[in-house]
Amino acid sequence: MTSLFPHQKAKALKPNSRRPAKELCSECGLCDTYYIHYVKEACAFITQQIDTLEEQAHQRSRNLDNPDELYFGVHQDMIAAKKQQPIAGAQWTGIVSSIAIEMLNHGLVEGVVCVQNSKEDRFQPMPVIARTPEEILAARVNKPTLSPNLSILEQVEKSGMKRLLVIGVGCQIQALRAVEKKLGLEKLYVLGTPCVDNVTRAGLQKFLETTSRSPETVVHYEFMQDFRIHFKHEDGSIEKVPFFGLKTNQLKDVFAPSCMSCFDYVNSLADLVVGYMGAPFGWQWILVRNDTGKEMLDLVQNQLDTQPVMSEGNRQEAVQQGISAYDKGVTLPMWVAKIMGVVIDKIGPKGLEYARFSIDSHFTRNYLFVKRNHPEKLAAHVPEFAKRIVGQYKLPE
């Protein structure tokens, strides 16, 4: 049998071996397959090429003079939504799971790449190709640790599947788009989630033990629009910890270096993005990037309550103050942090302005990280849209 592609002669890296991106590796899984053949072009942390891949995925790159596209990328539509009948046990209301199930049930795809957890550890990601609704539901709830989603790409090619849905985050999707034409698929659908600040499993443990009152019972957590981290516990209770009460001086080294050098918070290359940060509290935020994304969303439209996105407040002063506070590792007493959280929740940015606040805060932090730790990569690694966003603020040296 003759190989169609040179990657089929390549060999995956062995577990725990040094990765081509070195300390910036996000463990996306590409190097765990023979697609490592393309790693120099595909890896988001070796070759940043969001604008080129936007053209490939959406037939155009973002308009940098359009304020919404500058921040949120190419899109046809942007709405807030929630399921009329939420899926039990879902992190939000279950929109991502519902779309995946409908695509499978309608025969649009033969499999769904998603992430379950290992039987031994609910926070240990286990990528799978789901072929039934039950297998999709077993993957509900975000996994806050680095996850090798693309490690199953060899299985996809060898299975003979021709129509596939991949659910993933920005760094995974950049690598996926870079090798998309080598997968032998007739149709690839990409459902993305926004993503920042993932951790290793050990880093997650440190974060939980430093921040939660009961780290051993945390089921999942999220940094929410009310400026608090919401920890959901096994008994169903929600623990809320204000952002401003985080022990920043102890947590600076927790987040993965890849996440500290990432500028694709909003998953620019997915067909459809489902998150929460641009929506009012209790709603999810949906970005339809292209016609394929619209096709996916249309499958569940009758299951959703929707409303237009909104924007309120001004983020810029809070972002500027936060740059210095984070850089100095300032930690407030919890009683002060709680008061600040209440006040900022009342008068602070909401909706799309909260999303811009979060993007600005992370991009300025990440720009400084790259500048200080990988200055030789700064010019090429930071996309033009991120440079414009960061350029609004005064940064420390």
Curated annotation (Swiss-Prot):
InterPro entries: Co_F420_Hydgase/DH_bsu_N, FRHB/FDHB/HCAR-like, FrhB_FdhB_C
A GO MF term: oxidoreductase activity, acting on CH or CH2 groups, with an iron-sulfur protein as acceptor
Pfam families per the UniProt record, alphabetical: FrhB_FdhB_C, FrhB_FdhB_N
Protein name: Uncharacterized protein all1601
Lineage, top ranks: Bacteria, Bacillati, Cyanobacteriota, Cyanophyceae, Nostocales
